[in-house]
Amino acid sequence: MENEKKILQCHSRGDKRFSALCAKVVIHNRTYTIEKIYQWSKRKSDGTIAGKSKPFDYFVCPFCGMEFPAEEVSFLYKGLWIMYFNDHPDLLEYASGFDEFVDIFKGKSINCQADVIAELGRDKEKVISEVKESDWYKTMARWTKGISNLRQLGVSLTYNINKGETAHEAIPD
């Protein structure tokens, strides 16, 4: 029995705390599941939401509404999980005690919650470093700094994705 691997079921029928359908993060003072944000972000060339497991041409960043190449979407997905575990460090510590991570709904998607959770459990700092090197993150850092500079100048600027302040619709409730 000592050699049995500990397996964490990362899906909605397993430990829901490790399911993108249940794990929640706050963006612009609103709470969304990681899955809702991720699926909302993926777009076809005409700007419509691509749909789960469907091909997509680019993604819309939920933080600022900017468009990014589809190749960068994994950094957004990892970033959302990093946000979640920053709010729930005890869960990442718990997950790091497992040997294997399973998502029974994995499919052919380029991003899998079990894979990301396993990566973060093994070496969170490495994943954070990789995300910070992405064009998506660097753009977000510049955008955030710009907002901060405007606030220091006394300019009140609030971006609210739910008011549709970009050409794209808001994340639906």
Where are the regions that the model predicts?
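N-terminal accessory segments that precede or flank the first globular/catalytic domain
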Residues: 1-40
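Generic recognition of cysteine residues
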Residues: 10, 22, 61-64, 112
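Active-site nucleophilic cysteine motif
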Residues: 106-120
